Each structure stands twice: as C-alpha cells, then as structure tokens.
Amino acid sequence: MSLKARIQEDVKTAMRAHERERLAALRLVTAAIKQKEVDERIDLNDEQVLAVLDKMVKQRRESLEQYEQAGRDDLEAREQFELDLIHSYLPEPLGAAALADLIRSTITELGASSLRDMGPVMNALRPQVQGRADMKAVSEAVKAQLAS
C-alpha cells in the first residue's frame, strides 16, 4: 500500500472513530499532498509524498519554537500532536553513526574531494536519507567531511 493510500485509509478510520483532532491533522496532510499534486499536475509517488511530509515537519518544528517563545501552550500542544502524527508516516530516522557511514561511503564512491563536489554528493544522498534525516544536518555533515 502506498503512503498516500495509507494516509487516506487513516482519514477514513479517524472519521469512523470520531477522532476530531486526528482527523483534522490528517486532513492537513492530505491537503498538502493534493496541493502539491495540483501545483505539479502529477500524481505523487511515495518519495514525493515523503518530501511533502518532510516540509511539513520542518514547518511544525519552526511553529513549535515560536509558540514556546510566545508561551502559547494551547497552540504548542496542537502543533506537537500534528508533528507526532506526521512522524508516524516517516521511515525510521538514521542514527548519527549510520548517517556518517553513509556520507563517507558516498563521498568515496563519487571520488569527491573538495567543497565543489558537495552538489553531486548531496544529490546522491538525497534519495537515501529523504525523510530519515534532516537535510540541513546532512548538508553540514557533508560539508564538514569534504572540508577535512
């Protein structure tokens, strides 16, 4: 079952169980997926759905920080619930050691030696770490390894 189909099934399940908060969060996810499909005029595959979910996670984290600073516990709780729900659809995150090994092997495989080679390294890594690691952290780790 594709990721998009699984989300649709979970929407139906939440409707039947009268889980309002979960249903609202799932509808936000489906709306983001549909928006991307309409914008691009394509049916999204699992990899593209993961990219949409990654973007939503990043947005939720930023919102959480802002709500914490503003002391808005009510909004913070809702945002955290949405973040947890989105995380349930993402694959298991990569550990720091596994990520470092993957970066090292990709750099070796491509023969990258300087910061100029960062683009091809990131392009090779992106499909492997999409949804499993924060791309900003991956970028910083690649930059650090290429600089040394």
Language model segments and positions:
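Charged, compositionally biased, marginally structured helical/coil segments
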Residues: 1-148
